[in-house]
């Protein structure tokens, strides 16, 4: 060791009294090219002398940041920064003596424990602040749902109103359609029943105007045939023969006496009732194809009269055209 120090002194460097200073003095010798280990004597001596001081420095400097990390974890506030600054100062003075760092670490820790009380108080204050902020947050959260709930309620009420209005409108339409087609249970039946009533009313008006008995019979027959063709769609040929059979019976009924007309009317009513029932049942199948404009107007008329009267009205209206009993037909309407 003495020979090494003498060599370094011969190079113009002061002798090192302490191992830490020896490491500092040996560092320039390494800079001369001995770092690669060519001269192992100087390389082995310098690290051996430098290790204790370096360890002490590491302990002095490393213990302080470790304590700094422990304190912020315990305190949880920004007050640890001044305590860390106070610790750095004694840590810088620690390398002066080997035993001094250990002795100073204890008071540093004690000091850290002492300021830990205000930091703990600050931590409690922060916790109290958080607790005070939590009710504030709760208070802030409570109005937010209160503000949201009325909006939701308003939306719900608005939706309910809109649905109720639409529901009432649909229900009214359904009720009218149901009243018009109680026997069939479809809106198309009411529409066709209204068509039959309209055709029968037009024929009755023509008969009352004083037209010839043959013309009104042909007119309602054609109208009924057209209505049944449009309603049945696929059974126009079957409807025509029935109407043709009913039409020839009407002229003799108008020529014969009332006594003879009564049984013929009963038979005609039965036949026409069957035809009208078929005509009312057919539109129930072909109801979806009926245009809405034609359904709307008859639906209002069908709301006042049930399906049975709607189907029976055309038969009663078609008969008075040939017979002189027009007032009872009007009364039936």
UniProtKB/Swiss-Prot annotation:
Q: Which residues carry this modification: N6-acetyllysine?
A: 171
Which PROSITE patterns does the entry mention?
MARCKS_1, MARCKS_2
| Stretches that traverse the bilayer | none
- Gene Ontology cellular component? actin filament bundle; cell cortex; cell junction; centrosome; cilium; cytoplasm; cytosol; endoplasmic reticulum
Residue segments, region Disordered: 1-333
Q: Where is the composition biased (Basic and acidic residues)?
A: 252-272
Ranges annotated as biased composition (Polar residues):
26-35
Coiled-coil ranges per UniProt:
none
Positions of post-translational Phosphoserine modification: 26-27, 29, 46, 63, 77, 81, 100, 117, 127, 134, 144, 146, 158, 162, 166, 169, 264, 315
Q: What is its main location?
A: membrane
The topology of this chain with respect to the membrane is:
Lipid-anchor
UniProt-annotated location(s): Cell membrane; Cytoplasm; Cytoplasm, Cytoskeleton
- InterPro entries with a match to the protein in the record: MARCKS (IPR002101)
Per the record, where are the segments of Low complexity compositional bias?
73-84, 91-101, 109-135, 199-229, 292-333
Establish whether keyword Phosphoprotein is in the entry: yes
Post-translational modification summary for this protein: Phosphorylation by PKC displaces MARCKS from the membrane. It also inhibits the F-actin cross-linking activity.
Q: Where is this region: Calmodulin-binding (PSD)?
A: 151-175
Question: Which residues, per the entry, are lipid-modified as N-myristoyl glycine?
Answer: 2
Q: Which GO terms describe its biological process?
A: actin crosslink formation; actin filament bundle assembly; actin filament organization; apoptotic process; central nervous system development; mitochondrion organization; neural tube development; neurogenesis
Cite a single GO MF annotation.
Answer: identical protein binding
Chain intervals with Basic residues compositional bias: 151-163
Family, per the entry?
A: Belongs to the MARCKS family.
| Function summary | Membrane-associated protein that plays a role in the structural modulation of the actin cytoskeleton, chemotaxis, motility, cell adhesion, phagocytosis, and exocytosis through lipid sequestering and/or protein docking to membranes. Thus, exerts an influence on a plethora of physiological processes, such as embryonic development, tissue regeneration, neuronal plasticity, and inflammation. Sequesters phosphatidylinositol 4,5-bisphosphate (PIP2) at lipid rafts in the plasma membrane of quiescent cells, an action reversed by protein kinase C, ultimately inhibiting exocytosis.
> Subunit structure, briefly?
Interacts with CDC42. Interacts with GTP-bound form of RAB10. Interacts with calmodulin/CALM1.
Name of the protein in question? Myristoylated alanine-rich C-kinase substrate
**Which gene name does the record give?**
MARCKS
């Amino acid at each position: 060791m003495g020979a090494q120090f003498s060599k370094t002194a011969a190079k113009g460097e002061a002798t090192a009294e302490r191992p830490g200073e020896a490491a500092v003095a040996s560092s320039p010798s390494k800079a001369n090219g001995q770092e690669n280990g060519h001269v192992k004597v100087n390389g082995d001596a310098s690290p051996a002398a430098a290790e204790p001081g370096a360890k002490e420095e590491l302990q002095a400097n490393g213990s302080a940041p470790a304590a700094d990390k422990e304190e912020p974890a315990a305190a949880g506030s920004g007050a640890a920064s001044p305590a860390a600054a106070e610790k750095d100062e004694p840590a810088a003075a620690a390398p002066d003596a080997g035993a001094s760092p250990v002795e100073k670490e204890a008071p540093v820790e004690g000091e850290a424990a002492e300021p830990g009380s205000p930091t703990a108080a600050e931590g409690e204050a922060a916790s109290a602040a958080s607790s005070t902020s939590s009710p504030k947050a709760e208070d802030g959260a409570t109005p937010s749902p209160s503000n949201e709930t009325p909006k939701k309620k308003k939306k719900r009420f608005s939706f309910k109103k809109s649905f109720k209005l639409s529901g009432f409108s649909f229900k009214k339409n359904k009720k009218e359609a149901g009243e018009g087609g109680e026997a069939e249970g479809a809106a198309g039946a009411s529409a066709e029943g209204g068509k039959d009533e309209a055709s029968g009313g037009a024929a009755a008006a023509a008969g009352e105007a004083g037209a010839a008995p043959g013309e009104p019979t042909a007119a309602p027959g054609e109208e009924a045939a057209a209505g049944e063709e449009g309603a049945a769609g696929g059974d126009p040929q079957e409807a025509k023969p029935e109407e043709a059979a009913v039409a020839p019976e009407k002229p003799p009924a108008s020529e014969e006496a009332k006594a003879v007309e009564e049984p013929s009317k009963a038979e005609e009513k039965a036949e026409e009732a069957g035809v009208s029932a078929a005509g009312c049942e057919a539109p129930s199948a072909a109801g979806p194809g009926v245009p809405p404009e034609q359904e709307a107007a008859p639906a209002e008329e069908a709301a006042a009269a049930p399906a049975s009267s709607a189907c029976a009205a055309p038969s009663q209206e078609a008969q008075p055209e040939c017979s002189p009993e027009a007032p009872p037909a009007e009364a039936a309407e």
